[in-house]
């Protein structure tokens, strides 16, 4: 007989220690998945990165600010073929007043006169109505010196003075009484002149 001891039994007390030390033995017919390790020096990718969002074919992602045709501006859903109701309309025959634009009209009691100057340009002057070259001075623009002036007036004997004198003679007045109408300024013609350049502007006749 040989004096060598028999080999240890595989299921003996040392078997669990070998399994814990070297890991579970590989199962025959199955291979462990290969794990890709990054090359040395490169950081590991974060573990929370998931797959890209799923996009159905033929429907791209909408751009920021794009409103689908079936959605309103406030985000409410509108079924196809639905149109928002129109806003309130004014009653039939009513038209809202538009903005008022004042036109170039003179104020009440005013009158627009056009005075020609020697250069050929037209100057528009607004004077008081009822005092346009009559028996009182008038504010206007001199057509000669082109300055804003108040006309200077002078009285001259005109046709109305002679008519009133002949009327007095016809009524049997004395020779001296028929000269009285020639002394009253209210019966004389009025001549308007420029106080600056002394130029003649207009003559107002009591009787044409």
Curated annotation (Swiss-Prot):
> Where does tissue-level expression of this protein occur?
Highly expressed in brain. Expressed at lower level in heart, skeletal muscle, kidney, pancreas and liver. Weakly or not expressed in placenta and lung.
Task: Tell me, using the record's free text, what induces this protein.
Answer: Up-regulated by p53/TP53.
Q: How does it sit in the membrane?
A: Peripheral membrane protein
Name its GO BP terms in alphabetical order.
Answer: intrinsic apoptotic signaling pathway in response to DNA damage by p53 class mediator
Q: Where in the cell is it found?
A: Late endosome membrane; Lysosome membrane
A Gene Ontology MF term for this entry?
zinc ion binding
User: Which superkingdom heads the taxonomic lineage of this protein's source?
Assistant: Eukaryota
* Bias-annotated ranges (Pro residues): 1-13, 36-67
Start and end residues of each LITAF domain: 122-206
Carries keyword Kinase? no
What InterPro entries does the annotation carry?
A: LITAF, LITAF_fam
A GO CC term attached to the entry: nucleus
**Is Metal-binding there in the keyword field?**
yes
Residues recorded as binding Zn(2+), renumbered to this chain, are 142, 145, 194, 197
What the record says about its domains? The LITAF domain is stabilized by a bound zinc ion. The LITAF domain contains an amphipathic helix that mediates interaction with lipid membranes.
Q: What does this protein do?
A: Acts as an important p53/TP53-apoptotic effector. Regulates TNF-alpha-mediated apoptosis in a p53/TP53-dependent manner.
For this chain, the family text in UniProt reads: Belongs to the CDIP1/LITAF family.
| Name the record gives this protein | Cell death-inducing p53-target protein 1
- Say which species the protein is native to: Homo sapiens
């Amino acid at each position: 007989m040989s004096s060598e001891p028999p080999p240890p039994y595989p299921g003996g007390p040392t078997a669990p220690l070998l399994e814990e030390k070297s890991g579970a033995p590989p199962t025959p017919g199955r291979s462990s998945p290969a794990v890709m390790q990054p090359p040395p020096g490169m950081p590991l990718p974060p573990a929370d990165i998931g797959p890209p969002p799923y996009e159905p074919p033929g429907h791209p992602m909408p751009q920021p600010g794009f409103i689908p045709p079936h959605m309103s501006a406030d985000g409410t859903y509108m079924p196809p073929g639905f149109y928002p109701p129109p806003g309130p309309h004014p009653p039939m025959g009513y038209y809202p007043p538009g903005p008022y634009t004042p036109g170039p009209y003179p104020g009440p009691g005013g009158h627009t006169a056009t005075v020609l100057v020697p250069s050929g340009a037209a100057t528009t002057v607004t004077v008081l109505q009822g005092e346009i070259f009559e028996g009182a001075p008038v504010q206007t623009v001199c057509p000669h010196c082109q300055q804003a002036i108040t006309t200077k007036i002078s009285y001259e004997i005109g046709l109305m003075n002679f008519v009133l004198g002949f009327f007095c003679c016809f009524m049997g007045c004395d020779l001296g009484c028929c000269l009285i109408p020639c002394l009253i300024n209210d019966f004389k013609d009025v001549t308007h002149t420029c106080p600056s350049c002394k130029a003649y502007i207009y003559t107002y006749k009591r009787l044409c």
